[in-house]
Amino acid sequence: DILEHAILNDKFEKLALGSLICGLGFGNSSTTLGHGLSYVFSNEGIMHGHALAYTTTVAHKFNSSVFYERFLNIAKKLKFEKISLKQEIDKASDLILIDRKHLDSNPKSVTKEDIIELINKINHLNLS
């Protein structure tokens, strides 16, 4: 809530504390589909956090997450430029499927067809 409040209300002095708390949360849990999707974008030179704004947004929607709207509002507030995967989606989906660490911890099972659909959604999503 601290990081969300800082971003949505331009309380920049709270960003460091909010980021620290979020980082501690990641360190004590595991990441899921959003991270699994992000690496094929980051491997093409898109900054990891920028890629995550898109991949985590579609992952929240896919998982029917109660946090989807909150995350979407934060990502839109930050006005991330549109991203699009350059490599062939079928090959990218095969790479993502190998990343069992992130897919196995996801609350919903993920198929290759799901990944292809999610990448297509990311390629058409605009958060700016």
Per-range role (PLM):
Residues Y68-S128:
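C-terminal charged capping/lid subdomain of soluble metabolic enzymes
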